[in-house]
């Protein structure tokens, strides 16, 4: 879920940049399975005062939120069951949460679509994976407060036919796509008049390659993902219509990024929120900018 960026993200494609968000299918190095005895041991450890280990699931292929790299540079964390390491905004946030709460951290790499079921089954404690807090997801998992506030943007080629677009009306008739199971694909693209909507892509990397190769005119994504893409692909340009009335219409819940936990696990939600409430949007932006600045451009 690299040839060009987005460490793990763009790896699948050549290899990738943030709400909400998207869908991506990466090769799993750990199926995230936790036996009942292991789960019981975790609970016993917590009850006895032993240091808790937070098992965090993510795709490790969705830069700048998370990616895979071959060493521990910049503070990357080992991926469970693998010789590789994970880093990115999500890993930085997971480390910060565990540092504040005095917990150990374990990163579990898994396919994007398996995250909700892994959270629900208790195979992982939570998913910190760039997931937007949608009503559909809230049917199966609970969410913390947002740990990033994403905006939706459009990616085009600098020399493409829509490079001068100032709003959605200027995108009329465009051939467009995005990632599967995202608000970008399910909600936003249909707001473009006469859009030629291609099938959704499984990964961020393949989505970006479709634009780079000319298979589509534009893709819809979140701002961090687009920013990282522009680092990987200098011939791409991000169009932000947020200051115009003619913009994608979505709710805050659809683009705010949260940490998913098992339904009913209010204790974990409260613990994580106790860390997030001490942070500001400026803290999030600073952390995201750092992630974008160190994302691998090749692997």
What is each residue range found by the language model?
Residues 16-20:
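C-terminal motif of bacterial Sec signal peptides marking the signal peptidase cleavage site
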Residues 22-25:
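Bacterial signal peptide processing site
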Residues 34, 49-130:
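Extracytoplasmic small-molecule ligand-binding "clamshell" domains
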Residues 45-46, 183-201, 238, 270-299:
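Ligand-binding clefts/hinges and TM-proximal coupling segments of bilobed small-molecule sensing domains
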Residues 60-63, 83-99, 131, 153-208, ...:
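Bilobed "Venus flytrap"/periplasmic-binding protein-like clamshell domains
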Residues 104-170, 246-252:
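Acidic, polar ligand-binding/catalytic clefts
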Residues 114, 130-140, 187-190, 217-253:
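A ligand-binding cleft/hinge motif common to bilobed small-molecule-binding domains
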Residues 149-156, 232-273, 294-299:
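Periplasmic-binding protein-like
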């Amino acid at each position: 879920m690299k040839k060009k960026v987005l460490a793990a993200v763009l790896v699948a494609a050549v290899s990738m940049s943030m709400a909400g968000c998207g869908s991506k299918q990466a090769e799993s190095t750990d199926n995230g399975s936790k036996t009942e005895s292991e789960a019981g041991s975790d609970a016993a450890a917590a009850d006895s005062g032993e240091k808790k280990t937070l098992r965090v699931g993510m795709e490790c292929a969705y830069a700048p939120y998370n990616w895979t790299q071959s060493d521990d540079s910049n503070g990357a964390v080992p991926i469970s069951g693998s010789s590789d390491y994970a880093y990115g905004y999500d890993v930085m946030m997971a480390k910060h949460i565990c540092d504040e709460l005095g917990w150990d951290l374990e990163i579990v790499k898994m396919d994007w679509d398996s995250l909700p079921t892994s959270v629900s089954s208790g195979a992982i404690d939570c998913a910190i994976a760039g997931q937007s807090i949608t009503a559909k997801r809230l049917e199966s998992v609970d969410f913390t407060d947002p740990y990033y506030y994403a905006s939706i943007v459009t990616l085009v080629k600098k020399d493409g036919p829509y490079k001068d677009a100032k709003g959605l009306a200027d995108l009329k008739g465009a051939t467009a796509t995005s990632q599967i199971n995202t608000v970008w694909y399910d909600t936003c693209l249909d707001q473009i008049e006469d859009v030629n909507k291609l099938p959704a892509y499984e990964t961020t990397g393949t989505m970006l390659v479709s634009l780079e190769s000319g298979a589509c005119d534009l893709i819809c994504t979140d701002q961090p993902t687009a920013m990282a893409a522009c680092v990987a692909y200098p011939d791409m340009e991000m169009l932000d219509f947020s200051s115009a009335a003619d913009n994608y219409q979505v709710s805050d819940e659809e683009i705010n990024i949260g940490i998913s936990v098992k339904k009913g696990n209010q204790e974990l939600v409260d613990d994580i929120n106790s860390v997030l409430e001490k942070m500001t949007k400026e803290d999030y932006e600073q952390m995201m900018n750092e992630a974008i600045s160190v994302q691998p451009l090749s692997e």
